[in-house]
């Protein structure tokens, strides 16, 4: 199972370190994937930040791309926070030689028409990996599976732990890779988190995105004996 460190968090949320090069490097060295957010300044430069911010030497995307190239087999989940520069983004990823590592997701939260961005991204680059969203907020499995260009399904449980084994098997039958958000990211207590981790593992989910990457790794090792 792939462990994806949410914004580079690995021992819980750490606002002073999350999304930092230091934290991400630690995660990549551990063999984990990472989830980060990419944004663009008005003059066309890219930076890594969950919230809109001011470009500086520490958050400039060039610095992160240099880091990622040192770990070419690691998976980077790239959350698109803005709409309208897809052509330039694909060019940027290709120029920095990290396209094979990343998959793009969360376009549905910002696009004016469902599936529009995934279709455009596929037209721009036949190899770029795309994830479609599924959640308990009017984002059903059937809709996500209708995005033919998406090889990955990104599962969210905002208000309820609603996913079942049948849901996972339905997605697997469609031959999609499945990554799930860990419950603590949406405020669920750790008791439910551990239970959900075990269920996801048993059901065959391919990866979990969590703020507790270190604990998830230890937990998986305990299951394996």
Predicted ranges, named:
Residues 1-225:
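Phosphate-group recognition and catalysis centered on beta-loop-alpha active-site segments
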